[in-house]
Structure formats: C-alpha cells, structure tokens
Amino acid sequence: MEAIEIRNLTKTYGGDSIALYNVNLTLPQGKIIGLLGPNGAGKTTLIKILTGIIKNYTGEVYIKGHKVGVETKKCVSYLPDIEFIDPNWTTAYSISYYKDFFNDFDQEKALMLINRLDIPLNKKFKALSKGTREKVQLILTLSRQSDIYIFDEPIAGVDPAARDLIFDLILQNYNKSATIIISTHLIADVERILDQFIFIKKGSIVRQGNVKEVTSQKGKSIDEIFREDFRCLADF
C-alpha cells in the first residue's frame, strides 16, 4: 500500500483563483520527499489538504488507503509553518499536553531531545528565542510514532547552522518506516537528505523523480535543475 495517493486534485478559491490544478501523485512508504517550489506555488494548500485542514476540493486524496478524515489524522504528524504552541505554556506543559492528546506520543524521546539541546523545561514558550521555539515544535512533531510526517517550511526562519541541526534531528529521530514530506523553497539546504523530489509551480506538478537517478542522469544538483526549470517556466 502506498503512503499517499492523490488523483485529479484541484483546489480553487473564490471560483476563479486556482491554488492546485489536476494534481496526481503516488508517494511511497519509507521515503523522504521534498515538496519544492517558490512561495505561493501551492505547497501549503496541498499540505493543508493532506492534513485535513482544507476539506473543500475536487478529486480524491488517500492516506494509507483511507480518504483524508478523522482516521488519517491518527497517522499524520504535522509541523505547520506557524507557531502553534500557546505562548504561556512551558516546554514541560507542552510535552504533557502532547502525551495526553496523542496516543502515539513518546514522552521519553521528547524529554531526551529537549535535554540534548539544552532547552529549559520550565520557561514559557514566549520567553524562548525564535530558534528554540522552532526546535520545541519540531521535537513535539518528531516524538509521535507516526506513519507520515509533514513539515511545512521547517527551515524558512532559521540561520544556516540551525538548518543543518534541524535536518539532523529529523534524520536521527523519525520513524524509519515512515514517509516524510518536507515543503520548502530552500532547495540547496534540503536536497542532501531527500530520496525523492516534487517540483510544484502555480498549483501544478512540473517535475518529480528519484533524487539519485535524476542528478546522475542530468549531472546536476536538484537545486540547479530547479533553477533551470523555474527560470524557463518564468519565460512563459
């Protein structure tokens, strides 16, 4: 069974603004997949459909054989591109909340990662630096034992050194049989950890493939291919 199947997915806003158009994708289990495109390409809309936040669309979307809904929320761990922790919660309370809310949450793992990164347990979220707040949210997401992890722009607001740390955390601590989807416009930073990639432009899939196969065939990095593809597309 594939991790995710998408058939003829189209999403419009206001009747004439197309966010996604006729998207067809099959994503396997156990791979790290980059959803790559510029800001406004449709990445976040696609993610919000996969996570059940957006429900009004045409087409079919299946996760682990189930239509997106209550059942699929149980197997998807999602890190949005915004801060979602209550600013007055401490790190310790956030961990306790996740433990109570998610049956698959590994509290010991979360505490181990918090300790490893020297993050204070009893400070309120709003008192932490921006980079530390992002690490707390990432740790909470990774500490669920999920079949699918979805990260929406996890490195957009952090410096290059912190980006490497975030990717190392993901590589070292996710469920190895799971599918990971990382949405980003920072291609050069993410491609080293990807198995597969998807290029999305103006709501349509314009290229996808296996990272090793495509880079070997083209003799170029995914970042270079992305720049060429999107420079050509900008001419039309």
Model segments located where?
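Helix-to-loop junction immediately C-terminal to a conserved catalytic motif
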Residues: 51
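ABC-family P-loop ATPase nucleotide-binding domains
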Residues: 81-136
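Conserved ABC transporter NBD signature motif
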Residues: 58-72
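A short, flexible loop at the N-terminus of ABC-type nucleotide-binding domains that lies
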Residues: 1-22, 29
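ABC ATPase "signature
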Residues: 208-209
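Catalytic Walker B motif of ABC-type/P-loop ATPase nucleotide-binding domains
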Residues: 149-153, 158
